């Protein structure tokens, strides 16, 4: 257990807390006319002079202290400042970009007016109102599905992934590598943190240039104890996230961002197993890329893809998303919503963006849109991080409801000033944002009604809905049902081809059922958006019977990044 220092409160300047952490020093006390300074590295003349200037020119004496102790002291003594900045830093910087409030004042007025108008029309012309609603929903459903189809089809023609060869990695000198920070927010993960320490301990990067910051909530003593029992290497730092609200992953990450020393920074989840050379590949990819590229996204896939039907569908979805959809968005220079993990950032650019929005439960998607609005771009690096796919239905619904609720939040936040966003990113990119971020939850909300209406109308001979719906409405529903599902089945069939996992292709025919599950989750998401918008529905990890260390047989030709065992 790391014991924090007890610095003199008069010497500790809260406004310099980021400087203290990133530069690795801290004023402790006055001793015989000098200021004793805790420092993580011996003071060079240049660094000594810089610290003296920061302390008003007073002479200093050094006290070598591990970086972990310096960070622990800061987060302990300045916990109120860290908690406040992590929760409300973005809101103070730009209230309009924060999901702290679900609706702005003008949005509330618009919603009330729309509800009143719809209620009046529903009373006076109920059937006409219902038909208009179905017609509008049909347009949104089909437009969003067609958008995804054509973007993915476009992406299938290109390979824009930053490919890095082994010879390039071998040519890297440790002395030339930049400092890299790994952030790992964990909460109630005592059962898997030992595996986490092993997985991140395999990263091929000089430990003198690497800091792994594990962010643990203040009340989560069980996880903190489990980390200590796993005996992590010295470059692992456990940072206590001060109590506060909202208790979300992005809030914890904001604390980590304040103490991060790396030129580059990556987020991993507790169950992640990145390829060992991922950091080096990303350094090379950033060196090649235009300065406007501030994020590199590594691919994600699952080590337990073959566990059951649900995990197979997960793997199909991720294969299509990372191999085709992201590439298609990049080709068209459209906004790219980030994945929740394996995002590699230029740290300074991330700070300029205001970090993560702690009130948005899909902070990754929101950050991708904010980056795009400032002219930044997202790149893709050819490295895969293996994760645990949710294998239990209840956990899946909870996880997807959080993701869909976050898309709803992101759409509402960036709809507050639509004309400003259009000026920033252009009309075409705004349209793409609308179809992807707003269209996705709206599409899922429409799946159950469209499916039910279609089945009742065309597959139940005894049901006659002609008294309520003209044939044209019913045929539109059938068209949506057939075309929408056919396109998504086709896209999911495309996913495994690039990876050679042909054994997954047939499972894509179950996508209509998979979408029904998403539709259930979307209604839960909508309810939570109204009742508890900032609630973070945690996904339980460590539930799978599959592990990276205990491979199981996979069909011939299944590549390591999509097979059930990930066989590494």
What do the PLM-derived regions correspond to, one by one?
Residues 201-244:
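Acidic donor-binding segment of Leloir-type glycosyltransferases
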Residues 269-273, 356-359, 371:
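The conserved acidic donor/metal-binding loop of glycosyltransferases
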Residues 146-182, 186-209:
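N-terminal signal-anchor transmembrane helix
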């Amino acid at each position: 257990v790391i014991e924090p220092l007890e610095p003199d409160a008069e010497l500790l300047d809260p406004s310099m807390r980021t400087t203290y952490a990133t530069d690795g020093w801290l004023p402790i006390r006055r001793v015989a006319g000098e200021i004793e300074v805790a420092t993580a590295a011996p003071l060079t003349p240049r660094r000594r002079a810089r610290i003296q200037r920061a302390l008003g020119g007073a002479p200093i004496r050094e006290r070598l202290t591990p970086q972990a102790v310096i960070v622990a002291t800061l987060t302990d003594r300045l916990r109120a400042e860290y908690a406040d900045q992590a929760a409300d830093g973005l809101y103070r910087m730009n209230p309009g970009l924060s999901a702290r409030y679900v609706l702005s004042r003008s949005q509330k007025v618009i919603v009330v007016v729309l509800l009143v108008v719809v209620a009046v029309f529903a009373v006076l012309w109920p059937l006409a109102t219902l038909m208009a609603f179905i017609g509008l929903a049909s347009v949104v459903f089909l437009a969003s599905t067609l958008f995804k189809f054509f973007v993915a089809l476009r992406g299938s023609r290109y390979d824009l992934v930053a490919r890095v060869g082994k010879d390039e990695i071998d040519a890297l000198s440790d002395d030339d590598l930049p400092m890299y920070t790994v952030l790992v927010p964990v909460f109630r993960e005592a059962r898997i943190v030992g595996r986490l320490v092993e997985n991140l301990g395999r990263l091929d990067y000089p430990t003198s240039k690497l800091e792994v910051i594990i962010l643990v909530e203040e009340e989560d003593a069980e996880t903190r104890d489990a980390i200590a029992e796993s005996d992590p290497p010295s470059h692992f730092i456990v940072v206590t996230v001060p109590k506060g609200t909202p208790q979300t992953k992005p809030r914890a990450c904001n604390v980590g961002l304040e103490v991060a020393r790396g030129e580059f920074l990556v987020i991993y989840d507790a169950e992640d197993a990145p390829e060992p050379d991922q950091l080096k590949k990303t350094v090379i990819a950033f060196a090649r890329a235009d300065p406007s590229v501030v994020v590199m996204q590594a691919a994600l896939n699952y080590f337990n893809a073959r566990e059951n039907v649900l995990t197979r569908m997960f793997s199909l979805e991720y294969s299509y998303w990372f191999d085709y959809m992201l590439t298609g968005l990049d080709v068209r220079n459209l906004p790219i919503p980030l994945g929740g993990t394996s995002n590699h950032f230029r740290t300074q650019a991330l700070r300029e963006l205001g970090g993560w929005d702690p009130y948005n439960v899909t902070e990754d998607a929101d950050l991708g849109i904010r980056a795009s609005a400032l002219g930044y771009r997202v790149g893709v690096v050819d490295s895969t991080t293996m994760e645990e796919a949710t294998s239990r239905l209840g956990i899946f619904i909870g996880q997807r409801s959080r993701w869909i609720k976050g898309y709803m939040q992101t759409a509402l936040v960036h709809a507050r000033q639509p004309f400003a966003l259009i000026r920033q990113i252009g009309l075409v990119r705004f349209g793409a944002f609308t179809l992807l971020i707003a269209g996705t939850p709206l599409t899922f909300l429409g799946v159950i009604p469209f499916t039910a209406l279609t089945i009742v109308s065309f597959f139940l001979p005894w049901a006659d809905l002609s008294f309520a719906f003209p044939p044209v409405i019913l045929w539109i529903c059938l068209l949506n049902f057939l075309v929408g599902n056919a396109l998504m089945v086709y896209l999911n069939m495309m996913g495994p081809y690039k990876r050679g996992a042909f054994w997954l292709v047939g499972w894509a025919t179950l996508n209509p059922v998979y979408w029904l599950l998403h539709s259930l989750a979307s209604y839960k998401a909508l309810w939570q958006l109204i009742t508890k918008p900032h609630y973070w529905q945690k996904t339980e990890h460590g539930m799978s019977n599959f592990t990276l260390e205990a491979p199981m047989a996979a069909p011939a030709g299944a590549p390591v990044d999509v097979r059930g065992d990930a066989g590494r």
